[in-house]
Amino acid sequence: MLILRGAPALSEFRVNKILARCQQSQLPVTNVYAEYAHFADLTSPLSSAEQTKLEKLLTYGPTIAEHTPAGKLVLVTPRPGTISPWASKATDIAHNCGLKQVHRVERGIAYYVEGELNAEQLLQVTALLHDRMTEATHSQFEDAAQLFRSDAPRQMSSVDILSGGREALAIANVEQGFALADDEIDYLVENFIKLGRNPNDIELFMFAQANSEHCRHKIFNADWTIDGEEQPKSLFKMIKNTFEKNPENVLSAYKDNAAVMKGSKAGRFFPNTQGEYAYHQEDIEILMKVETHNHPTAIAPFSGAATGSGGEIRDEGATGRGSKPKAGLVGFTVSNLRIPGYEQPWESDFGKPGRIVTALDIMTEGPLGGAAFNNEFGRPNLLGYFRTYEEQVTSHNGLEVRGYHKPIMLAGGLGNIRTDHVQKGEIPVGAKLIALGGPAMNIGLGGGAASSMASGQSNEDLDFASVQRENPEMERRCQEVIDKCWQLGDENPIAFIHDVGAGGLSNAFPELVNDGGRGGKFQLRDIPNDEPGMAPHEIWCNESQERYVLAVGVEDFDRFEAICKRERAQYAVIGEATAEPHLTVADSHFDNNPVDLPLDVLLGKAPKMHRDVTSKQVVGKALDVTNINVADAAQRLLRLPTIAEKTFLITIGDRSVTGLVARDQMVGPWQVPVANCAVTAATYDTYHGEAMSLGERTPAALLNYAASARLAVAESLTNIACANIGSLENIKLSANWMAAAGHPGEDAGLYEAVKAIGEELCPALGLTIPVGKDSMSMKTTWKDEGDSQEKSVTSPLSLIITAFGRVDDVRKTVTPQLRTDKGETSLILVDLGAGKNRMGASSLAQVYKQLGDITPDVDSPELLKGFYNAMQVLVADSKLLAYHDRSDGGLFTTVAEMAFAGHTGVTVDINGLTGNDIEALYNEELGAVIQVANSDLDAVNAVLKDHGLATISHIIGTLNSDDAIVFNRGKNTVLSNTRTELRTMWAETTYQMQARRDNPECAKQEFDAKFDVKDPGLNVKLNFDLNEDIAAPYIATGAKPPMAILREQGVNSHLEMAAAFNRAGFAAIDVHMSDILEGRLSLEQFKGLVACGGFSYGDVLGAGEGWAKSILFNDMAREQFQSFFHREDTFSLGVCNGCQMLSTLKELIPGTEHWPRFVTNKSERFEARFSLVEIQENPSVFFNGMAGSRMPIAVSHGEGHAEFANDNAVKAALDSGTVAVKFVDNYGNPTTQYPANPNGSPEGITGITSTDGRATVMMPHPERVFRAVANSWHPDEWREDSPWMRMFRNARKNVG
């Protein structure tokens, strides 16, 4: 083992955070220094030249001053016996650089801890420095050799039921966490006695996963008796009733990994069989899926949320015969945050068990995990919600603590699929059964069964064993394979595909062959395996991520294999399909068959559940408002996390990748996160698209189960009504149900809620629920040490509805931004509560530690339908200037958020509304506030009247020029604050979370910027005509210069880049680095080259650096690239990851001596922003005629800080005239202030060119915003093109 010292691993503020945690734990630590340590396992010794090459490979990241280490060593490495995702990618890079003797390279962090610490205190510090789920600690470097040990395979065991009977299996059930019900134990004993043998542990694990509540949804399929009366339908049948009543536009429901609805016809953009990107006119259907990943997120929030998103993405990709995930959503419900130093008056501490983390930890790490996976995979995350609730209340079961110690972690999204791929094909006998994706590792074992238990029923080791790990770059490679398959149309080699989720291969392969009407013979040792010491059940049942199972016909296999090799996606043929429905898993190592079962024993005839339950009634207590002050209530509500600003959850997630995002969360020139819904364009040549929104009112279930469900459905509609969708038939719903099954009253309540929407509301509205998910163990129980009394926190019955819709014109989406540039306007409240003002389970009740008695409800489905249809008429006719639904926090919050987005004052008169001031301002009845031009008032009122809304529509106010938010009742002022006062209160939660999680200096700068009353917001200044197509004369010649759209494994922004160059008149050619390294393509044939954005090699060895070094240290590749850059008829562009890559290649590129390196952002966080930049005077072929222009652009990167050697180097770059693009503030001044400069680069530098202008690199993404509609905000006068299209047309003009 070769040990190589690496660069410092922690910045100053990261060290300070560790020291602060040590001080909180009263540990006498005076200093901590950390640096990376690399460990190389070699098959033969390296020459001195090879070792130098390896050392250069392992030199990466920002320049931080090195120290001479002092103090006690705590070496943190990946857990021995595992291969980390970092190692697999770093090893790939080493091999691509010719270092074949490197069997594996791993990375650790060497912490040097100073201070007078005894052994116990050092152990406590060690616990703070590592994650026991994925890491191990050592006291000396030599111990890292354990990383490369290879254990002998362990044998399977069996449970002796032939002699021990039922009792033997019952004991094993508890010890191994199978979560088998009593009748399932009986069923297994009976069947194995029939087979005349004992069950192997692998068979029991497999059965437990395949038949867990998580996988088989036993409660939703159960028969029900409530209060002694048999019920006519199961829960699932009531959901299916919505489809039976309204099947229109549903192409697939209930039978696949995701549901599919009718989409739009447009030009799908992807490479043809010759590799040139082109439009393919076809129906682009919409697929939808929403999952939850609650149990793992309570144990390990980052990995739990990351793998939740990853599993949902795989569900989408594995729909039909392969499809394309497009846009994501994420949501969290947790108990009270109790941010230290920022605790709120309603946040009581009811304790928690030691095995789960705090709500604050979940909301610190969980969103980062979900965002990181989506970012690296390349899916924009455009929608979400965040709710906190934890309170002792009197509900259906009397006085008890209700909250979310077991959190809700929601992961979902939409995608697209070809019509002829919606239905899975037949699996031919003899078809190859393939595992696509990563290797088996001993992680996530028993996840399906563990998540099916109430938290506290399994032991702590099993809880930790049930959490999976994430490798999104691997999943991206797999998706590229799936994409290349579906793009072949009729020649698609995939006959059948499933994702690998709960239960691992032991669930996925049986499901695959069973659904395809076949059986299967499998070879256990053909499964790619990074932990050879695993026992058979661990190999077969582990939940290693980023895997799919597929059936490919023998005649199609060569084509499939070639695609996998080009994309460098790991695959293995594990078995073949058989005509007999039997499952055999052979083990060549031990020469036995660990699994040998008829499929119907595993999947077919397990006992059906029967639920015999009793309903309970709640007697609420009316909300006591006698001591509630209107102003105090407003301040509390703005600090309730459910209502407070969500920027800390949003800017960590890429919202522009694909270049198809038409509406993200951030609204208007001030980028305020208040959007009602998310909207995407179907493709680059159309305005058709897709929308999705969320609806949830979970606390209402504490008073009225059915009303809570109805409110969730209704809120999803009031959120999506601002998009141009048309008929309700164009909307389909996903329903995600969470309940504490078995808790008194909750089962009957669940039945009541499902019936309310499945049998009643959705059929009345014409809505269908073709997809959903349930999680039935939402209760946490524990005993404190030394206390025999059991404690518990039980979640309210929770329904999260996601609405998906086909959009006719994505340009017509209305946002909450109040418009100050449209003349005289009025605000109208449409009150679907019709003046009832019911306050039960409201946010106001929560912040005063009450519950209330009567909740809002959907009293009239017809009125709700009328509201939706009226909004659709007004949206289609462009009569609405702004729209925002009323929800948490009531009218006050709705109006305040609209004012924040519009950067304006507003005056509201509630004189025409019923109820007292508190009820009028803070009730959460359904409805919306719309802004309309006074010149359109008559037309708008006529539409409202035509839809039965006249009597519940009230003109409530208008804008003011005082920058104040004022609520009056007649001549009396009820509430008055400056907009800035309320805006900064609303921002406090996000500031507190950012300051704790990220660089506190950056967090403070962002918070302080919100006090700037005169901030003009994003603005545009152009020195050219953006509608002039300067490439048109060249396109008219018919010549299409070949443009290499270059990508490496993990790159994810190549499609939008190709679309931009295609529009400019180039022949955009798909070029993978493997094409160059293996000689399939040469750069000699191209005039232009663009290195695209993404996460090449998952940013291992530095962002873009691994990609660059695979060129620099590969003689053939180095020669090709150097030759290309030196040809005077070529030009090149690097964007984001491509910018980082080309800047590392600068020794090959003439005239780039002033180029910086691009390293970790100053915030040390991935930054997704819509930032203002200015083009500088520079020689770049891309920016000809654009100097002095100022316009916004998408930014999405974690390592974009331009690092120069020193201040003199910065000055030299500026003096050279090669700086091309700078970040500027909203006043037009170059800036280093965060977040206007999201990475902290000196002088705002974010783009630079070579001295001759032929090579240009920039961190922001022009290719994602070349269409006007893809900009988060743009001036009304922009038509189809944004100003960034000029860049690509300049390149075409340059070629001539």
From Swiss-Prot:
Residues 300-325, 1232-1253 are annotated as: Disordered. InterPro entries: Class_I_gatase-like, FGAR-AT_N, FGAR-AT_PurM_N-like, PurL_large, PurL_linker, PurM-like_C_dom, PurM-like_C_sf, PurM-like_N_sf. Its main location: cytoplasm. Signal peptide: none annotated. Its EC number is 6.3.5.3. It catalyses: N(2)-formyl-N(1)-(5-phospho-beta-D-ribosyl)glycinamide + L-glutamine + ATP + H2O = 2-formamido-N(1)-(5-O-phospho-beta-D-ribosyl)acetamidine + L-glutamate + ADP + phosphate + H(+). ATP binds at G304, A305, A306, T307, G308, S309, G310, G311, E312, I313, R314, D315, A675, S887. GO terms for molecular function: ATP binding; metal ion binding; phosphoribosylformylglycinamidine synthase activity. It is an enzyme of class 6 (ligase). PROSITE patterns: GATASE_TYPE_1. It comes from the Bacteria. GO terms for cellular component: cytoplasm. CDD domains: GATase1_FGAR_AT, PurL_repeat1, PurL_repeat2. Keywords: ATP-binding, Cytoplasm, Glutamine amidotransferase, Ligase, Magnesium, Metal-binding, Nucleotide-binding, Purine biosynthesis. It is found in: Cytoplasm. Residues 1043-1296 form the Glutamine amidotransferase type-1 domain. Mg(2+) binds at E715, N719, D885. SUPFAM superfamilies: Class I glutamine amidotransferase-like (SSF52317), FGAM synthase PurL, linker domain (SSF109736), PurM C-terminal domain-like (SSF56042), PurM N-terminal domain-like (SSF55326), PurS-like (SSF82697). Phosphoribosylformylglycinamidine synthase involved in the purines biosynthetic pathway. Catalyzes the ATP-dependent conversion of formylglycinamide ribonucleotide (FGAR) and glutamine to yield formylglycinamidine ribonucleotide (FGAM) and glutamate. Monomer. In the N-terminal section; belongs to the FGAMS family. This is Phosphoribosylformylglycinamidine synthase. The lineage of its organism: Bacteria, Pseudomonadati, Pseudomonadota, Gammaproteobacteria, Alteromonadales.
